Amino acid sequence: METSEILKKVRQIEIKTRGLSNNIFAGQYHSAFKGRGMSFSEVREYQFGDDIRDIDWNVTARFNKPYVKVFEEERELTVMLMVDVSGSLEFGTIKQLKKDMVTEIAATLAFSAIQNNDKIGVIFFSDRIEEFIPPKKGRKHILYIIRELIDFQPESRRTNIRLALEYLTNVMKRRCTAFILSDFIDQESFKNALTIANRKHDVVALQVYDRRVSDLPPVGLMRIKDAETGHEQWIDTSSKAVRRAHRDWWIQKQTELNDTFTKSNVDAVSVRTDQDYVKALLNLFAKRN
């Protein structure tokens, strides 16, 4: 994509998503994600009713009387966007590509973050870590992120969510809120990595998918190509049995995915490319309040 085209698209996305974050998500984002981390504030003398687990034994020994550590809600968050850039995101049959919706959702979350004085960073991943953008504040930083979202060219077309989660756990030393934006087509189990990551951080899953992945249209013979492996096959979509089998496969896959999120205690939301992601995000925020 030419530089002028990229800049034009960056501007278009900024106008749309910044408006959403300012006018619709302002209070919702704050209440959904603020106050989930605690930081040390001060030490004071023990008072009746204080939790004995908060006693600072070093200070207590020094002054020969019990002192406790006082914590307060962290006033700013570090937000990480974990963006799937594998080949399957370059797919879309209705309205827009999955990649385009992921870009808009990521930009909306980014503007919501800086509006609340939070730092925002990005992990682009396929079956490897493609790029890590360290968390920072500011509009200039957000515009750089949007530009990367629009024009990023991954080295690999495959996906490995487990690897991305392990990277998050290792590279982010302090607690953060991490949004995974993916179609979650990855077949490899990532439940253990997700559980471990969510113990250290606040992980939220955002699934973006195309309607034709869940429901095949009855259009006769159709050639299907796996965007990640390149494997092709022909199927007869005029057959009700074929369409039903595909639908059953999708339902089973979604059931397993939702089970993974539930067992890992991770909030998740799914949205189709022909649906309104604003409503999906508002539902997610409401779930967390």
Go through each PLM region and give its residues.
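An amphipathic, basic-hydrophobic helix/alpha-beta surface used to engage anionic
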Residues: 1-130, 135, 177-180, 187-188, ...
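Von Willebrand factor type A / integrin I
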Residues: 1-33, 42, 51, 170-174, ...
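Short, flexible loop segments at the rims of nucleotide/cofactor-binding pockets, characterized by
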Residues: 58, 154-158, 181-182
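Short amphipathic alpha-helical interaction patches enriched in hydrophobic/aromatic residues
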Residues: 89, 93, 149-153, 265
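Conserved phosphate-coordination/catalytic loops
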Residues: 100, 155-162, 248-251
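Short, contiguous clusters of charged residues that form electrostatic/catalytic patches at enzyme active sites
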Residues: 104, 108, 159-166, 255, ...
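Short, electropositive alpha-helical surface patch
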Residues: 132-147, 259, 286-287
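Von Willebrand factor
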Residues: 141-176, 188-190, 210
